[in-house]
Amino acid sequence: MKTELTLLDRTLTLHRFPNRSNETLQAWDAGDEYIISHVEEMNLEPGKHILIMNDSFGALSAWFSKDHDVTMMSDSFISHRGALKNLQRNQSNRVNFLNTMDDIPHGIDLVIMQLPKTNRHLVWQLSQLRQALPEGCQVIGVNKVKDIHTSTLNIFEKYLGETKTSLAKKKHRLVFSSPNCQPIQTVEPFVEWDVDGEDIRLKNLPNVYSGEALDQGARYMLEHIPQDPELRHIIDLGCGNGVLSVKAGQLNPQARITCVDESFMAVESARQNIKDNLGEEGNFQFIANNCLDGFKKNSTYLVMCNPPFHQQQAITDHIAWQMFCDAKHVLSNGGKLIVIGNRHLGYDVKLARLFGEANVETLELNQKFEILQATREPANFNK
């Protein structure tokens, strides 16, 4: 796996986060190289204030912070931590970190953005740029050619201004736009809906998975959250909008519930949904984190988990494996991990390897999903 980005007589050492010994994926892509080359050809005067949005692991921030004042804005805790590590690794100049719910700073001279995965997040970011940037400030986006559609360009035109694209290079394309003087399109941050068959109403911020309806996996999982008066602490790992936590809180009002996600918008959505559905009297925590980094061993009784199978734009199963390992670490003896996943992902095999085959059972399955339960045995359990 390549860890050195060499371009225009400069070299940066870049790693993904978390740093794994058997990593097979790079911390940058051809889109980063394309946009770096283009901006360097612009011959900007040193000291420009550059806003970099959705920088996966800090390659763009590390590059441009050498000569410019850089603000990095991302919804991803993983991206923030990865960028910080890479900035330190390359002894880069200081970068200001923001999440995508923060206000866009004044005095931006140029915006560089990796286009987000969902149109709803793109609409949000462009609408925020439109309100904050001076007319004519250039915005340069980049993405794979196959992911830039006519609808993508229409969103730029509608929410920002006149838009054009570059030629394709290494399967990537640049998008050029700037704010115009037309009336601003107002975008509400939340969408709301009721969950059919449940006494639950949900709000989702723009970058939260399954933005305008409950995804099938979460709906299936709702039916299998345990009700146990002995439960004292529940962790919702990869909480998304917090729907599992809301249901768990309804069933187990005595329990302390901790919502964890790497998306700042997901954590804030969970906070809002628990407040709206359960009130403010309960004992709840909301943490943006890399899985369960920093959590104490043997500190909880139940972990609920609906793992993602992508990190940034890459398809990968290492996040699920890290979630399972972290869950085992924090579970008390006899504590349980309940997982939902697509059947083809083979989570049963992974859990059996980690917890022991005798301690993994299938709670429910249908043609698409399976719900698995793994029980933590005492430390002297012989595998």
Swiss-Prot record:
It is an enzyme of class 2 (transferase). HAMAP family: 23SrRNA_methyltr_G. Specifically methylates the guanine in position 1835 (m2G1835) of 23S rRNA. Keywords: Cytoplasm, Methyltransferase, rRNA processing, S-adenosyl-L-methionine, Transferase. GO terms for cellular component: cytoplasm. It holds the Pfam family MTS. It catalyses: guanosine(1835) in 23S rRNA + S-adenosyl-L-methionine = N(2)-methylguanosine(1835) in 23S rRNA + S-adenosyl-L-homocysteine + H(+). Its main location: cytoplasm. Belongs to the methyltransferase superfamily. RlmG family. InterPro entries: rRNA_m2G-MeTrfase_RlmG (IPR017237), RsmC/RlmG (IPR046977), SAM-dependent_MTases_sf (IPR029063), Small_mtfrase_dom (IPR007848). CDD domains: AdoMet_MTases (cd02440). The keyword Methyltransferase applies. It is found in: Cytoplasm. GO terms for molecular function: 23S rRNA (guanine(1835)-N(2))-methyltransferase activity. This is Ribosomal RNA large subunit methyltransferase G. Its EC number is 2.1.1.174. Disulfide bonds: none annotated.
